[in-house]
């Protein structure tokens, strides 16, 4: 499995991410996004499921979600503020991609973050969204 590594230690990302974190590609329709992954068991297990095609559903005008084919390890935290571009695991098998920022009391396991999430809201224009994740 080939994974790309970001070489920009000065990027404005979550400090819990390593200096040279692993990244994966995410495609919604013909738009490609880069997702920087957290260094945790859930993110590592997620990479092992790639390539992965999901039909994600819109919910609450701030997220899209889909059940994964297999459970992933979870270590949920209460982030308080969810940021647009956060890729999280809800429970052990539901992948959630947030396209709007808001306050939340829910608990999630962080998987990663879309590096430039500005175009995500425009991609969520229907109830069911095809999303593909690749490790290269």
PLM feature spans:
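Boundary of Sec targeting at the N-terminus
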Residues: 7-10
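N-terminal secretory signal peptides
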Residues: 15-65
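Glycine-rich active-site loops that engage anionic ligands at enzyme catalytic sites
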Residues: 50-136
